[in-house]
Amino acid sequence: MKTLPAVAGSLVGLLAVLSLPGPEPPVAPAPARGHGFAWNQDAFWRSLEKTYGDARAVGCRAADPVAARELSALGSAADRLLGTSLDPGAAVLDSVERRFFTLASFVAACPRHLGGYVRLSGSLREAIKWQSRRWDVAGDAARARVYRSLYGLRGAVEEVMLHHPDSVTALLDGRHEPSATPATTVHGVEIHSGDILVSRGGYPTSALIARGNDYPGNFSHIALVHVDSVSHVASAIEAHIERGVAVSTADEYLGDKKLRIMVLRLRADLPQLARDPQLPHRAAALALERARSGRIGYDFEMDYTDASRLFCSEVASSVYRELGVTLWTGLSTISGAGLRRWLASFGVRHFETQEPSDLEYDPQLVVVAEWRDAATLRKDHIDNAVIDAMLEGAQAGDALSYAWYRLPVARLAKAYSWTVGRFGAQGPVPEGMSARAALRNGAFSDRQSQIAARVTEAAARLTNEQGYPPPYWVLLDLARKERAASDRG
């Protein structure tokens, strides 16, 4: 009879030990060169909604000619930008940006010019990318200009698309950049070995990766393409949180939940490629060989200088760096105190790093094609707004908390995961992630999903009331309101 109390006492003692939280993870300081970007144009955004309402009121017969004139004028401006070098602070770039945003209101009201508006965005993106080749994109002025142009162009186009979801063209051509590396065609897009796929997953953590940046973006994941020179079979080399570096077929890559994908390619006129046109293929082959030669764990610390473990961006950057091409011209920075505290609780230790969204701004790369899932575009924008609102809360002191009694179970799950991992299996807690980090990750995802569900309902009601979907700044207002409500209750 004495055995039972002894066993019970031991179990209580074990539970108490497993429930001890331990010290909070260290939070690295903000990068010296980092600071958050802010548009500071709230009044202008609100005025665009009024312009849209006025255009609807006067009707397309009056609004269409205005849109046609601006499309033509901005198209001519894009042509001029491709031939005249400007400083990133040039006033003409501010003017083009503002006119493009204003034009969105007319095209949203009268969609006859939607196709032309989308093509114009591609022309302007090409012009800004060309301009940026001469800029110091690591400097504040150039970085802000490239960001507000490329991110802003996409945002304006998608606001228009959300007004006319049945007219959305999912696949948009970019620049047809020549390449000497092996190629294949996947869903109508010719991809070459060494191309880089930048995508956005459909999970709460995907939205956090995309938005958790001094320059909040649209993308959360990087994969490097390898095309076999004989069979022309395409593979994607990528790093997953759950299983580290892995090789996927094209179908497996596309089968994983994605809201958008962009294909990037090194410019053919780069000096490194002029000397060795097969350099991108050699980089892809090197990544493929390493991925198949042994397990490479996921780098939760986001240390882009250490190739012993890799996060998704490092899969591409590490092999290209070995061959003389340094990607992410101008490193990503994460400065917000609340965001750094949250990311540190997940295991991140480096806040000057390589964020997926920022690769688009590297002037060494061109956009070959861009695909977006029209059916989930609204979800993409709502997730962004919710994350932005949650990060405002983090900056104000919101913590990622979990019930204390879940910690012992999580630690046992971590021990189980470690054990099965020795035999090549995958447990519930990824290698390199602590039990507490896993609990906080789950708490974050649950809260984001709950707020997003309420914002989705509120946005649907507002759409029914006013006859058009709320723009992003209104979604952000709704997200702030729902976040505050969740804090209270």
Task: List each model region and its residues.
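Cysteine-nucleophile amide-bond enzymes
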Residues: 2-489
